[in-house]
Amino acid sequence: MTTFRNHCPHLDSVGEITKEDLIQKSLGACQDCKVRGPNLWACLENRCSYVGCGESQVDHSTIHSQETKHYLTVNLTTLRVWCYACSKEVFLDRKLGTPPSLPHVRQPQQTQENSVQDFKIPSNPALKTPMVAVSEDLDIEVEEEDELKARGLTGLKNIGNTCYMNAALQALSNCPPLTQFFLDCGGLARTDKKPAICKSYLKLMTELWHKSRPGSVVPANLFQGIKTVNPTFRGYSQQDAQEFLRCLMDLLHEELKEQVMEMEEEPQTLTSEETVEEEKSQSDVDFQSCESCSSSEKAENESGSKGFPEDSNETTMLIQDEDDLEMAKDWQKEKVCNKINKANADVELDKDRDTVCETVDLNSQETVKVQIHGRASESITDVHLNDLATSQILPSNESVSPRLSASPPKLGSLWPGLSPPHKKAQSTSAKRKKQHKKYRSVISDIFDGTVISSVQCLTCDRVSITLETFQDLSLPIPGKEDLAKLHSSSHPTIVKAGSCGEAYAPQGWIAFFMEYVKRFVVSCVPSWFWGPVVTLQDCLAAFFARDELKGDNMYSCEKCKKLRNGVKFCKVQKFPEILCIHLKRFRHELMFSTKISTHVSFPLEGLDLQPFLAKDSPAQIVTYDLLSVICHHGTASSGHYIAYCRNNLNNLWYEFDDQSVTEVSESTVQNAEAYVLFYRKSSEEAQKERRRISNLLNIMEPSLLQFYISRQWLNKFKTFAEPGPISNNDFLCIHGGIPPRKASYIEDLVLMLPQNIWDNLYSRYGGGPAVNHLYICHTCQIELEKIEKRRKTELEIFIRLNRAFQEEDSPATFYCISMQWFREWESFVKGKDGDPPGPIDNTKIAVTKCGSVMLKQGADSGQISEETWNFLQSIYGGGPEVILRPPVVHVDPDVLQAEEKIEVETRSL
């Protein structure tokens, strides 16, 4: 949004008006229909006091403007001004009385007799006053510290073979986007889920980066919380640093994720009869790690992906009704079309997977099949592309075998958005819009990337394209033969990433000793003595190299319905802000484990990933600088982890060895045996922009409007190379107000910016929406009260019915209910989950035999009374009914009489 100040010729007709006048008018009603707010409009014409309703009612404000030629009006809820004659929003440089200053607000340095107090506007009395942004909020580089006083140089004590955790935590701690989020937006680390890992991590980051710089701290609380969730890390045995990283980031994502509502437009080229597999947000998925495309790992992952464990205690399960399902389908259709339109191809959905298409050369007419893989479904959507050139198909022909993280995965999408996720809010389109539920967190914002992979059948030329979200790249370390193929430019030899396994060899204590000898000798002997040097670019090239699918690793073509020879490879569609690279040094077999100790050369600056970028990718920055590296010394069965990290405040490298922190040279880091590397996008332009905005904040001019902006987005602006469009939706509801649940800590969510800063940020990054006034949403408050009343009523009725059921001596009928669904319902009525569950789903506990529904043996089910079942079923619907009837034993009256006689005789004795 650009600024329209002094471009509206009707500003001269505005009369003098004070904030008290606007507040008084906002408490009134429309002068014609008597309807009350919100969203009343006040006429700004000189000596006109008219107040009318907006478009949500009869729109008397527009009628008043047409009849009286009074063109300027102000929304009494948002304080935004609209000119009917110019048909645009205008910004006032004068006319509104200067409001009094707000107390207890940070003030930046005053220059040219201008203070921050000139920019404040009155806040909602029910909300705490947000702080005004200062230079430190916009530019991390203003925190110039002396080298001897640099923060972040605090060690971590080893509390029982926990060097793997200490190295991982130090590596994450030196990732500025994540650490700065917890330091600047610590108020957002809120969760009702146990064991509240985000709060323990916040406390740890505060201690590590405190100005007092303690020598070392003990991460006991964080470690205890992780052990509670993941039993893998219990005990005192050595664990894997990368697995710990995955577990920690999964837990942080689960606790910090927020549901985001996006408006999606329905593509005009699609009809309602076309069906597409249901899609959910990729950020709700437990993050994946892109593994190398070896045949053995591919088979292992495919076999392991058929069934996933479910965390029924904490996981929010979203069961969509038919309308939600249609919205998800339409959303997915648009994502497919966005990708196809980028390839300049015509799109036509075909429901018949086995449609016979004429197969010709790739340079002429080609049929490409886009597979949308849903983990909860095996349905596949076929999208046929016509006139697709070879250059648009082959560069993305590689399938990636995802390796799931340590924590239980959730169902989710393999289709992150191909188009920019944030668009300027404009209502000019006449297309029907859909709402789509999406989840995001600071973890997904920082570490999520997208890989586009494809497999081509060499018989029918069908190409299967898949998009997958990754959190880290697991790269193979190529051997001598692989390096020769990679470095050969005379012939396009296909390099198989899986062949790197030949570099493994059994190791023992002798190898442990020889490793240190070799490390010393390597530094003294020329590299040609040991053979070719393996670089990180070689590992990336091996990962992204084309791979033949033949022999035991043939491709199962769905068009041919047979195993066929194929070729696969992949490219990156979207690079993350911080790229986590895992070098596959360990291989764990059934009887033994091995380790590759090959030195991999990696750059400290200027890692160029352009060769691995998809041609149609919108990515602009593909150069990365190293932040930290985790190293492992020893063998696969024993060893020690350390981390080398670059301090962001003084740009010096340090070795973090448990509680010991030592400055090291760059050459020491480059000679390290890297295991996990963290690279950050590099952008001089972003640093210049931060300095420019920071300088503007110190010399800002007075303005009458103050803008509120998300702290989370400001953290992105402060630490990201590509912060993306401004997003204020993290503190706004869908109605434009403050959600009642966030009202108590609104000061932790937003900062105030003067108008000139907002204009500069908005003109460069777009996004929004613009917010000039904070108020608690009345509509959300009513909905919240309704949902709380519903929770209370359902819980009370269930307790009463269940108590009556427990008092029955011998109930004739039991109704079985899925405990998975019941846990979701229990989380809802107890206030742990904001959304009610979907329909009752007993399909997992039911089995049909001889035409009747019976309880499946060993099913995770509970027993309730018929009255309780009818109560829940009347609210949520679903089924099927699973009824248990205890067998009735018929006793012969003569036998019963004889037993009673014996009992009487026994008592008489």
UniProtKB/Swiss-Prot annotation:
Provide the positions where the record notes the PTM Phosphoserine.
407
**Superkingdom of origin:** Eukaryota
User: For this protein, what reaction is catalysed?
Assistant: Thiol-dependent hydrolysis of ester, thioester, amide, peptide and isopeptide bonds formed by the C-terminal Gly of ubiquitin (a 76-residue protein attached to proteins as an intracellular targeting signal)
Give start and end of each DUSP domain: 684-777, 785-888
- Keyword Ubl conjugation part of the UniProt annotation: yes
Q: Where is the active site?
A: 163, 640
Instruction: Enumerate the InterPro entries for this protein.
Output: DUSP-like_sf, Papain-like_cys_pep_sf, Pept_C19_DUSP, Peptidase_C19_UCH, Ub_carboxyl-term_hydrolase, USP_CS, USP_dom, Znf_RING/FYVE/PHD
Q: What class of enzyme is it?
A: hydrolase
Q: Where does Zn(2+) 3 bind?
A: 43, 48, 64, 70
Acetylation recorded as keyword: no
Record PTM: Ubiquitinated via a VHL-dependent pathway for proteasomal degradation.
Residue ranges of coiled coil: none
Name the residue ranges with Basic residues bias: 421-436
Q: Where in the cell is it found?
A: Cytoplasm, Perinuclear region; Cytoplasm, Cytoskeleton, Microtubule organizing center, Centrosome
What is the E.C. number? 3.4.19.12
| Chain spans, region Disordered | 261-315, 397-436
Query: In UniProt terms, what function does this protein have?
Result: Deubiquitinating enzyme involved in various processes such as centrosome duplication, cellular migration and beta-2 adrenergic receptor/ADRB2 recycling. Involved in regulation of centrosome duplication by mediating deubiquitination of CCP110 in S and G2/M phase, leading to stabilize CCP110 during the period which centrioles duplicate and elongate. Involved in cell migration via its interaction with intracellular domain of ROBO1, leading to regulate the Slit signaling.
Q: Which family does it belong to?
A: Belongs to the peptidase C19 family. USP20/USP33 subfamily.
Q: Any idea what this protein is called?
A: Ubiquitin carboxyl-terminal hydrolase 33
What organism does the UniProt record list as the source?
Mus musculus (Mouse)
